[in-house]
Amino acid sequence: MTTQTNSEPLTNSTEGDDIILRTAGLTKRFGKLEAVKDLNLELRRGEVFGFLGPNGAGKSTTVGMILGLVAPTSGQIELFGHSLTGNRWDQLRRVGAVIEEPAFYPYLSGWNNLEALARAIGSIPGAKITEVLERVNLLDRAGDRYDHYSMGMKQRLGIASTLLRDPELIILDEPTSGLDPAGTKEVRDLIPQLAHEHRAVFLCSHLLHEVELVCDRVTIIKQGVMLANAPVQELLTKGQLLQIKVNDPGQAASILTNLPWIISVKRENDYLIVDAPKDSASEINKALAESNIFASELVNRNVSLESVFLELTGGDSGD
């Protein structure tokens, strides 16, 4: 039984129409398992939003609730300023989703597949098919059979199919999974362009480097609980990764681990990889020198979204 605690809009009138998606206290339990716990999300128009977490984190359950496929146990979901507890289809018509590999007729051309879909939707002219194929750079291959398409072309045709109805929110689940480098770049280049057309893109992916390149903001969850929610650049500039070579890495790791302001210490052969507050290198040197441990090398290592993700999730990958 779904319980929605409040039917009042989550969005106040001063925020305008920029907020496309908002959840408040979103929770889903399967028996005793709490798959999603008290999740608060917000997605604005023009934004590419990354939704990240290890396997089993609750990403698919969350997407299912947003799309009306899974009933929340408690909490609220609001699309375009309206709760999904009302006439949800009015809101969901404005949402497009590509979940895993799109399903098309393999023996039909790209054009004919979209034409069949347009007939099923109704009131979509042929000019719109031309427009969306051109939008995803497939117009010159529209006459080719679907089963002759590369993986990247199939994924772009899937995105084209969602664009037939001009969605204001596009949900993409692993859109570059299984693609070769060329296909990955094609999809990666397309995603921010879609958001810049007064839409929002909700992106689920385990390819953290790709997320770092295309997303404006990310939420990271683990076991249904939000661990981080911030602009990508903010996450990348919060700390400092230092690569340190010392004469006694074991003792050095013990000393640094006991410093309350050190975030983490990992050992890689003769090196220590230290996640610490910005501009703390001199303090680290001082702490080691007081125990007669001296760094022969201390250099900055670039902070990546992957390193932030692994730190927050305790080493769980997104695969």
Where are these regions (language model features)?
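Structural motif detector for alpha-helix initiation sites
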Residues: 110, 232, 302-305
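Generic structural signal for secondary-structure transition and capping sites
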Residues: 48, 103, 158, 168, ...
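ABC-family P-loop ATPase nucleotide-binding domain
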Residues: 1-27, 315-319
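ABC transporter nucleotide-binding domain
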Residues: 186-275
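ABC transporter nucleotide-binding domains
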Residues: 18-23, 28-222, 228
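Short, charged/small-residue-rich alpha-helical element at the C-terminal edge
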Residues: 241-312, 319
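Short low-complexity, flexible loop/linker segments enriched in glycine and/or proline
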Residues: 219, 311-314
